[in-house]
Every structure is written in C-alpha cells, then in structure tokens.
C-alpha cells in the first residue's frame, strides 16, 4: 500500500505472512514429538512515511515481525564445570523496530546510503528445565535475543570518478549484543569498516582492491560457549578470564581480478 499526500511525501505500508512445517533436520537427535509437528508462522507488518525529491529518497518505518515454534537443540553447560547436556526447545521470538533509511545523490557521481535501526527482539515461551542438580531452571521470556543488537547503523558513501572507476567506503555499527540466554554477559558496540576501489578496465577485465577494518577495531562477538545458564549474579566471576567465541576480522588488504568472455 502506497499513498501520496503530496508530490514528494506519502504513506506506505505492507504485510505478509509465511507458514511452513518443521524441516526434517529439526527432528535430528530427538525423533518427532507432538510439539514438533506444529506449524511455524512468520507474520510481518510494517508502515511509515516516505519523502522523495531529485537528490534524496527518505523512508521511515515501524516494523513488527514474529516467528512461532522455533525448534532448537540447545547444548547447556553446568556453570563452572565441563558437564553439558542437549535440551530440545520449542519457542517463539518477536521484535518491534523502527528503521530510517536514506539514498542521497548530492552531485554527479556521488551516492550515499544511510540506515538506522532500533529494535527489541525478545524470546517468548522460552523455558529450559535445568538438567543439573543445584542449578535453577531458565525462563528467558522477555530477554533480548542473543547475538542480535538493538541498534544498527550503516553509512555507505561512494563516488564514481568515471563511469568505470568507483571509490567506496562502508561503515557498519552493531550495538551492544548479549552473549548468552540470561543476558548476563554481553559485548560492547562495535564498528566494522570497509573501503575499496573498483575499476572496469574493459568488457573482459575488472580489477578491485578492498581494505577490511581500516579503523583497526579489536574485540569479540557472537556467543560465549558454556554460559547458557549463567546468571547475572555470577557474571562477575568471569572477568579477566579467557573464554571462547568469535573475533572481529583484523585489518586486511584484498585484491581481486575477474575475467569474462
């Protein structure tokens, strides 16, 4: 749905709903149960405003999306030990978010894409009955989904020196992300940066050079293994300890060439 209030300004909205039954790999290790036969439903609703003129295309929208009956086999570890067990989980997730994006062309050859998102992805019906004596059950209802930041931003300027020679930069910000289900451990926000040049030499040859992480950001991301049941009151015990996880891509130079016939 799109409705123009003026020549440049208007309203937009749309909605979709997708459904499917669980995939065969989601039965792995447990065999089918009555709960696992339930249909997965993914509704999406969004609406907002847009403004367009000769040099800018601006859109701001509110979005709601959810997914029911996620099937997961969560490996949980008893805090402070190496004991672990696999638990079958069937849960829901939902998020309400606000996104504003802009496509800007200030002068010939220059283009800027910018995007900002604030969202709150949360778990619903997420309950783990602790398989370990002395370790409390986990109720993650209302907790922020791990590995998903609440704040996202993108800034992507580019400039075509000639129709065949293009310079570009990309700045991507990921806000604070939680590293476990209880939201006891988290990673601070970070920037990921890229830049490069692309040259179409002729119809057969294209050359490129890319710089990854040119701001030389350092840090970790993802999850922390073995921390699924760790409570907030216990999180301090892990300060200054080495733990496994993912790391940001280091400063890297990449060169490419492609041939087409």
Pin down the residues of each PLM region.
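Hydrophobic, lipid-facing positions within transmembrane beta-strands of outer-membrane proteins
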Residues: 1, 43-47, 96-100, 151-155, ...
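Membrane-embedded beta-barrel scaffold of Gram-negative outer-membrane proteins
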Residues: 4-14, 18, 39-96, 105-112, ...
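Transmembrane beta-strands of outer-membrane beta-barrel proteins
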Residues: 11-13, 47, 58-60, 112-114, ...
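Transmembrane beta-strands of outer-membrane beta-barrel pores
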Residues: 15-21, 28-30, 53, 64-68, ...
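C-terminal beta-barrel architecture of Gram-negative outer-membrane proteins
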Residues: 21-22, 123, 146-200, 215-216, ...
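Outer-membrane beta-barrel translocator domains and adjoining extracellular loop/strand segments
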Residues: 23-32, 70-79, 83, 119, ...
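Gram-negative outer-membrane beta-barrel transporters
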Residues: 64-66, 88-180, 256-258
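C-terminal beta-signal and adjacent terminal beta-strands/loops
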Residues: 176-177, 199-261
């Amino acid at each position: 749905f799109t409705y123009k209030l003026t020549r440049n300004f208007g309203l937009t909205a749309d909605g979709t709903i997708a459904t499917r039954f669980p995939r065969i790999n989601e039965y792995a290790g447990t065999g089918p149960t009555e709960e696992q036969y339930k249909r997965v439903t993914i509704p999406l609703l969004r609406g907002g405003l847009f403004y367009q003129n000769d040099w800018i295309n601006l859109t701001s929208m509110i979005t709601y999306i959810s997914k029911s009956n996620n099937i997961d086999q969560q490996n949980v570890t008893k805090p402070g030990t190496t004991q672990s067990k696999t638990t079958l989980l069937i849960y829901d997730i939902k998020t309400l978010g606000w996104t504003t994006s802009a496509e800007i062309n200030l002068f010939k050859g220059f283009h800027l894409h910018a995007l900002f998102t604030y969202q709150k992805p949360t778990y619903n019906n997420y309950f783990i009955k602790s398989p370990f004596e002395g370790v409390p059950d986990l109720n993650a209802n209302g907790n922020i989904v791990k590995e998903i930041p609440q704040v996202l931003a993108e800034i992507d300027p580019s400039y075509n020196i000639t129709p065949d020679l293009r310079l570009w930069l990309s700045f991507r910000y990921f806000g604070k992300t939680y590293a476990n289900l209880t939201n006891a451990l988290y990673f601070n926000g970070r920037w990921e940066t890229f830049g490069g040049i692309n040259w179409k030499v002729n119809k057969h040859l294209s050359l490129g050079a890319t710089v990854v992480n040119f701001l030389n950001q350092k840090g970790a991301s993802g999850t922390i293994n073995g921390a699924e049941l760790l409570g907030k009151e216990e999180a301090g015990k892990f300060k200054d300890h080495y733990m496994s996880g993912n790391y940001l891509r280091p400063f890297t130079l990449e060169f490419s060439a492609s041939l087409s016939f």
